[in-house]
């Protein structure tokens, strides 16, 4: 059966490069100051979506993300791997959202997209590690949900068969469509970008990224509509501004500290019995061991 699949994806700060400017004064992530990447577990989810597309002729895969205009980059990265379209939720009213406000915005967008069979995303994002957004989206849409998925084995007769991780092993479950699925980072890694698709979509942009008239390639967007990515505001998805962004986020970060572990002093030991015995005695005296 042909499936309409939406992949929930997030552009996240690269946590390997967190510096002193990582947070704003309001306690939110300063995304402009940090390198941005495609959330790793969302790539695992994208791979599952693309496999389903291959197994079910006529299926489509779309990338849904929320963020500033530069977040359109992860839609392009999805297109380079085989996705068909994408939607970027971008509006200052979306800014500063916690998981509750984020799931509300994504759910309203999914309603606007309409007739979705499978919503699939990573288990959690590396900038929050809450694993809340997927289940909250399912709850707001009133859909079945399967979390901690390793693989979507098949979709047949209106049901998805999914292998998921549980304590002490794995289980295989069957869920009626439509369904929301969250995927673990231990699932199959996402395929690499396809050179032909990179050439096809490298100039795909949302309207806020569009080059000014008269600049090179600006005429491409009339000639090739597929290069224009969908860009939606709060109003476009009929969202309630009181449930979006900071206004709709009951979670408040009171303070954040950057903790750096540093050794105050170091000692060089040899492999001699005397050095080893001396170190053990010192650790015992300092109550570090024993």
Predicted features and spans:
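N-terminal glycine-rich FAD/FM-binding segment characteristic of electron-transfer flavoproteins
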Residues: 1-290
């Amino acid at each position: 059966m042909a499936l309409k699949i939406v992949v929930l994806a997030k552009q996240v700060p690269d946590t390997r490069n967190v510096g002193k400017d990582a947070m704003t004064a309001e306690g939110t992530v300063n995304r402009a100051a940090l390198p941005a990447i495609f959330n790793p577990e969302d790539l695992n989810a994208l791979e599952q979506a693309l496999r389903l597309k291959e197994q079910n002729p006529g299926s489509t895969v779309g990338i849904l993300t929320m963020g500033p205009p530069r977040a359109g980059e992860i839609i392009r990265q999805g297109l380079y791997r085989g996705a068909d379209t994408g939607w970027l939720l971008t509006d200052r009213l979306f800014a500063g959202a916690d998981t509750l406000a984020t799931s509300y915005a994504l759910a309203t967008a999914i309603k606007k997209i309409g007739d979705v069979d499978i919503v699939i995303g990573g288990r959690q994002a590396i900038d929050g590690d809450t694993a809340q957004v997927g289940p909250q989206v399912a709850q707001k849409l009133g859909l079945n949900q399967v979390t901690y998925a390793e693989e979507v084995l098949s979709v047949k007769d209106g049901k998805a068969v999914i292998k998921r991780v549980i304590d002490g092993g794995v289980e295989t479950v069957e869920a009626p469509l439509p369904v929301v699925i969250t995927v673990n980072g231990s699932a199959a890694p996402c395929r690499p970008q396809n050179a032909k698709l990179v050439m096809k979509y490298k100039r795909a942009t949302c309207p806020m990224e569009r080059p000014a008239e008269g600049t090179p390639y600006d005429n491409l967007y009339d000639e090739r509509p597929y290069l224009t990515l969908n860009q939606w505001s709060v109003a476009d998805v009929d969202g309630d501004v009181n449930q979006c962004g900071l206004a709709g986020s009951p979670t408040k970060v009171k303070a954040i500290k950057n903790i750096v572990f540093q050794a105050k002093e170091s000692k060089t030991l040899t492999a001699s019995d005397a050095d080893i015995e001396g170190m053990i005695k010192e650790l015992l005296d300092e109550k570090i061991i024993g």
